A protein has these predicted regions:
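N-terminal acidic leader/helix
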Residues: 2-28
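Acidic, low-complexity, intrinsically disordered interaction modules
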Residues: 18-72
């Protein structure tokens, strides 16, 4: 991950741990993102979707605050 994306992921995780169920916003870097829980999965398991620099969507799958999978 590049540094901008790392900072953005950290900021999104901080919001997630404040118990906000679904967040859609634009980061200071101009990327749109959505973070949400997946009800079909375990507790503290969620997805973080965002648009990267090239306009492609990137999907990160987290358990707690650890990235366990991603799709580009």
């Amino acid at each position: 991950m590049n540094m901008d994306v790392e900072k953005f992921v950290e900021a999104a995780l901080e919001l997630k741990f404040k118990s906000i169920d679904v967040i859609t916003a634009m980061t200071e870097f101009g990327y749109w993102y959505t973070i949400y829980e997946d009800d079909t999965m375990g507790e503290n398991e969620y997805w973080l979707d965002f648009e990267d620099e090239s306009g492609d969507m990137v999907y990160y799958h987290f358990i707690d605050d650890v990235i366990v999978d991603w799709e580009f």
